[in-house]
A protein has these predicted regions:
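HhH-family (HhH-GPD) DNA N-glycosylase catalytic core used in base-excision repair
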Residues: 2-5, 12-221
């Protein structure tokens, strides 16, 4: 769900034009991928460059918390199309800046057609920024905190069909419960598991997906 580099083939370790690191050795756009949830160019590029690659940057963690919460009840494709608008509206996903949003900012966001104009989701993003800062203060970084739910190491699964993928796990249940206890909103277990998939806490690429081995190697580093 992100922008890609200009070359037709991504390097083994590179950076997209949005600044996001990715790991890939396959064409940046494929007509088909075994991970069949990626059905259009934007989703396939996201799948090929980001999905499942371990995240260790707090701004990116806040981005995924914000976007996954916004996606509740909607399709991920919808959020992908709005991602750039979210990046602008939410100050490059800087939690320190978002935490300072007030009534004027809420009014601005409700008028922004580029994002999901839902008051509950907007207010939750602001509240989540404040909770995020509290976690950073307690643990040093959100990254150090959140990876504890998988003991600091990605879980590498071996799914052969999409129907095998779980919607939630014991780990996502634990994450959801603790995040809610810390004041986060729109962080149910299903949302938490989707975030774990996206940020590489689990590798849920199918074993016959060209990205499976590359993401597994990244997870072992």
């Amino acid at each position: 769900m992100r922008k890609r580099g200009a070359d037709g083939i991504n390097s083994v370790l590179g950076r997209s034009d949005s600044g996001t690191k990715f790991i890939s050795s396959i064409p940046r756009y494929q007509e088909k991928t075994p991970c069949a949830w990626a059905r259009n160019e934007l989703a396939i590029r996201y799948h090929d460059e980001e999905w499942g690659v371990p995240v260790h940057d707090d701004h990116r963690w806040f981005e995924f918390i914000t976007l996954e919460g916004a996606q509740a009840g909607l399709s991920w494709d919808t959020i992908l199309r709005k991602r750039d608008a979210y990046r602008t509206a939410f100050k490059q996903f800087d939690p320190a800046r978002v935490a300072k949003f007030g009534d004027r900012d809420v009014t601005r966001l409700l008028a922004d057609a580029g994002i999901v104009r839902n008051r509950l989701k907007i207010n939750s993003a602001i509240g989540n920024a404040k909770a995020f800062l509290a976690v950073q203060k307690e643990f040093g970084s959100f990254d150090d905190y959140v990876w504890r739910f998988v003991d600091g190491k990605p879980r590498i699964n071996k799914w052969r069909a999409l129907k095998q993928l779980p919607a939630r796990t014991i780990e996502s249940d634990a994450m959801s419960k603790e995040l809610i206890g810390r004041g986060f909103k729109f962080v149910g277990s299903t949302i938490c598991y989707a975030m774990m998939q996206a940020t590489g806490m689990v590798n849920d690429h199918l074993v016959n997906c060209p990205r499976y081995k590359a993401v597994s190697r990244a997870a072992r580093k």
